[in-house]
Curated annotation (Swiss-Prot):
Pfam families: Meth_synt_1, Meth_synt_2
Function description: Catalyzes the transfer of a methyl group from 5-methyltetrahydrofolate to homocysteine resulting in methionine formation.
UniProt-recorded name of the protein: 5-methyltetrahydropteroyltriglutamate--homocysteine methyltransferase
NCBIfam families recorded: met_syn_B12ind, PRK05222.1
Residues at which L-methionine binds: 435-437, 488, 603
Organism: Bacillus pumilus (strain SAFR-032)
One GO MF term attached to the UniProt entry: 5-methyltetrahydropteroyltriglutamate-homocysteine S-methyltransferase activity
Top-level division of the source organism's lineage: Bacteria
Length: 762
């Protein structure tokens, strides 16, 4: 009979009340000392461990906790310190500097962790890097837990293949050499764990799900070398986020357990297990509870499914796990949460998901009858949720059925629109603008809190927003920007704001998840049909436009980003959800245009992150993603200029889709890519309006005019000057006012310098 245990891959770091975030930001602002920071973070780490112990998880991970990012942890641990930071002597200062930058050094690039909403710091390989193990972070975490609770844990290590795959700075022909140089470091790290008495270590290799058969075979040789050095150490080789194509090769790796995702694999991992079997000498770590969404599990269905997995694999032992780290969901249901009970009962966060695993284990070991009450409770909660979410959305159904190609297409082609818009908008060469949001000061946040607590009336709050909007319109005019924004002071989050005004969304007060560093977000919950109910942005945008002769952009979040940054329902397709959102936004775009707004930005920063991991699955997603954007924007007049914005992406993969959006102008985060996208544009010109971010908004440093001028000059070598825009990387909500104004002044000056150069060479 198969032995059944429960295991976890990782737990949220931020704490139930975001204690982790608050400790970091307080330290960065100089409000607390290092001792307080370290003490608070230790407390959060141990609290997370205790939660997992309390939920009766048999194999608890340690080492997944971080002060900023687990990929950065790995880079620093192996001494991958970019040269521009090596003059810093203090390890903690260096660590934070790589992530956040300093006044003299640009931070390392940040990008999406596979196809999730989490961002990691991209490790930088440099030929001058001295490869060495500077400290053993997984061992430190293991010993800390053992001292505090006296329990064995499973240290988590980012795998060698994935670490190199996520890094930058090397040529393809250097990969093997870098891997070989890292093998002794990984061996040393694991040897120290073995010598400390560690029984199990989890090595995360999610990059194997997209690896070729040849790569999977080559990586096997790496693990043969490493594991031979640590014969007493049991290794779980963990994959997640999709299926493994080279399954037959993977299961021959010289490790004691293989971790597979049976939730986000489109059924392919189970098919492989049934077709090829599973090694009798290995443990199957089966990801059977969704680690990335927040819906309660149908325990009866899951019990049947797990039984099917076990029957197909017939392993000696199975570990029931989430499909991935629980980093991507909130910590637990907060006691002060104010959701409708019918909805709340249908949700499951990290802590509740662990309880589901424990219940499934009981059902497998004692029989379904032993958990009948839990199965019935879950079934009833999901039925109640379905009834709560019920709605026909007749308007959407009728519109959806009547769609034709003209609903996805602007009246005329881009070149003709460009001519019309140039005459209508009368903008200078290299127009300057921002991406949308301005700093939300303590005063802004305080005003919002007073309003939400009913300490302020709607009229009082509206008056405050108007005052702040006018102040920033004046600031923008003084700076000399060409196309202005209203600043988004009424918005907490670019998705939450729209979801609160659309039918079919629910919002929490405490369900925070980590986005990057200390940045946390509360993703909306799409539980029902999405519908437009009333104009959402017209009032604020029209007011801002009334204050200036310059054009003010309407600012909307696009349908794919709203979908990808939400916890979506799972009873209809993602395409159908995106189209529902697109119909709602289409009405908002039309309302803005009707109100006299000539420039409308529909942001799609999350378009690329929704890509399936396997390239063979891309075409369908990219097709409906572009369709949903065009459905949102194609009903406007030729004089109306449609902008979009994207960030944190490897755009080379989706340039055809960017073209397919048919936006008049796209602004792109660029400054942290260190010129990589320009190399691509040199070979593959983009001929519509384009703004490449000229400075990094994730860092408090103010870039010089010369620095931004260089980026503009480099861009103009490959971009048409008559359709190039100058802008920051992203919105400025999280920055402080003085640095924002200083940076924008330098940006406008850099644009003016570039215009003069162009005039001299005309």
């Amino acid at each position: 009979m198969t032995i059944v245990k429960t295991s976890n891959l990782g737990f949220p770091r931020i704490g139930l009340n975001r204690e982790w975030k608050k400790a970091l930001e307080s330290y960065w602002k100089g409000q607390t000392d290092r001792e307080t920071l370290l003490s608070t973070l230790d407390e959060q780490f141990l609290t997370a461990i205790k939660t997992q112990i309390d939920q009766q998880i048999d194999v608890v991970p340690s080492g997944d906790f971080t002060f900023y990012d687990h990929v950065l942890d790995t880079a620093v641990m192996f001494n991958w310190i970019p040269e521009r930071f090596r003059s810093l002597k203090d390890p903690l200062d260096t660590y934070f500097a790589i992530a956040r930058g300093t006044k003299d050094a640009v931070s390392s690039e940040m990008t999406k962790w596979f196809n999730t909403n989490y961002h990691y710091i991209v490790p930088e390989y440099e030929k001058s890097t001295e490869f060495k193990l500077t400290h053993n972070k997984p061992l430190e975490a293991y010993e800390k837990v053992k001292k505090a609770f006296g329990v064995e844990t499973k240290p988590v290590v980012l795998g060698l293949y994935t670490f190199v795959s996520l890094s930058k700075g090397y040529e393809p022909n250097e990969v093997k050499e870098i891997q070989q140089r890292l093998i002794p470091l990984y061996t040393q790290l694991l040897k120290e764990l073995e010598e400390a008495g560690v029984k199990w270590v989890q090595i995360d290799e999610p990059a194997l799900v997209t690896a070729s058969y040849e790569d999977v075979k080559a990586v096997k040789e790496i693990y043969q070398t490493i594991t031979e050095a640590v014969p007493a150490l049991n290794i779980l080789l963990q994959t997640y986020f999709d299926s493994v194509d080279a399954y037959e090769e993977l299961v021959t790796y010289p490790v004691e357990a293989i971790g597979l995702d049976f939730v986000h694999d489109q059924g392919r991992n189970l098919d492989q297990v049934k077709k090829h079997g599973f090694p009798k000498d290995k443990i199957l770590a089966a990801g059977v509870i969704d680690g990335r969404n927040i819906w309660r599990s149908d325990l009866g269905e899951r019990l049947t499914f797990v039984s099917e997995v076990i029957a197909g694999a017939q392993p000696k032992e199975v570990w029931l796990q989430p499909s991935s780290s629980l980093l991507h969901v909130p910590v637990a249901k907060h006691p002060s949460e104010q959701l409708e009970e019918k909805l709340l009962n249908g949700l499951s966060y990290a802590t509740e998901k662990l309880a589901e695993l424990t219940t499934l284990k009981e059902g497998l070991t004692k029989g379904a009858a032993a958990i009948e009450a839990a199965i019935n409770e879950a079934e009833q909660a999901l039925l109640t949720l379905k009834e709560f979410a019920k709605g026909t959305n007749a308007d959407f159904t009728a519109e959806r059925n009547n769609l034709s190609s003209k609903d996805f297409k602007r009246p005329v082609a881009f070149e003709e629109r460009l001519r019309i818009q140039n005459e209508s908008l009368e903008l200078p060469l290299l127009p300057t603008t921002t991406i949308g949001s301005f700093p939300q000061s303590a005063e802004v946040r305080s005003a919002r809190q007073k309003w939400r607590k009913n300490e302020w009336t709607n009229a009082e709050y509206d008056e405050f927003i108007k005052k702040e909007t006018k102040r920033w319109i004046d600031i923008q005019e003084e700076i000399g920007l060409d196309v202005l924004v209203h600043g988004e002071f009424e918005r907490t989050d670019m998705v939450e704001y729209f979801g609160e005004k659309l039918a079919g969304f629910a919002f929490t007060k405490f369900a925070w998840v980590q986005s990057y560093g200390s940045r946390c977000v509360k993703p909306p919950i799409i539980y029902g049909d999405v519908e437009f109910t009333a104009p959402m942005t017209v009032k604020e945008t029209v007011y801002a436009q009334s204050l200036t002769e310059k054009k003010v952009k309407g600012m909307l979040t696009g349908p794919v980003t709203i979908l990808n940054w939400s916890f979506p329902r799972t009873d209809i397709s993602r395409k159908d959800i995106a189209f529902q959102i697109a119909f709602a936004l289409r009405k908002e775009v039309e309302a803005l245009e009707e109100a006299g707004i000539q420039v409308i930005q529909v942001d799609e920063p999350a378009l690329r992150e929704g890509l399936p991991l396997k390239e063979s699955d891309w075409a369908d997603y990219l097709n409906w993603a572009a369709e949903s954007f065009r459905l949102s924007t194609s009903s406007v007049q030729n004089e109306t200029q449609i902008h979009t914005h994207m960030c944190y992406s490897n755009f080379e993969d989706i340039v055809d889709t960017i073209e397919d959006l048919d936006a008049d102008v796209i602004t792109i985060e660029h400054s942290r890519s260190h010129g990589g996208f320009l190399d691509y544009l040199e070979k593959h010109p983009y001929l519509k309006g384009l703004g490449l971010g000229v400075y990094d908004i994730h860092s408090p440093r103010v870039p010089s005019v010369e620095e931004m001028s260089q980026i503009i000059d480099d861009a103009l070598n490959v971009c048409p000057t008559d359709r190039f825009w100058v802008n920051p990387d992203c919105g400025l909500k999280t920055r402080q006012e003085p640095e924002t104004i200083a940076a924008l002044k330098n940006m406008v000056t850099a644009a003016e310098v570039a215009r003069k150069k162009l005039a001299q060479h005309a």
